[in-house]
Amino acid sequence: MNKYYPPEEQAEYGVVWIEIESEPLQRFLVGQTGVMPDCFGYDTALREIQSGQKQTHWIWYVFPQIKGLTTDTVTEYYAVTLEEARAFLEHPVLGSRLTEISTALLDVDAFDLVSVFSMIDAFKLRAGMTLFNRISGGNSVFQQVLDKYCFGVEDSFTNRIMDGSLS
């Protein structure tokens, strides 16, 4: 039973007695399949970005943020440590999807994240782009998204957490 989350962790995230495997990054792979109630998979996310308008729920497991940015239970469940962010980017499925959907975002005929996402999701997207831009060393598709939609300005809270000055 060690490969499953303990019951107290399941209770914290509202999934008591559901056998969610605690393999590295499993929560993102499961999320991106679209099997979670009221959430949609990666294919839906990509189609929505290509159409220029996010309409359903999927941002947490497609564009994760650094742990410590929020107290929202779902967002924090999908938040990543620096180690997990590096593993996410290097993962053959998750990393390639993150690059693919970020590239698709560059092709959207808009220059305002709020016109593509809601205001709150625009903040989440900027935080995720900041995280993955920094761990990829900059000069990446993530920097291009920041340049196009955020005037090149990274999320200061993400940077402070990554720099160790905000916990």
Language-model regions, residue ranges each:
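Conserved, aromatic- and glycine-enriched, well-ordered alpha/beta core segments
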Residues: 4-123
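A charged, amphipathic interaction segment
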Residues: 99-167
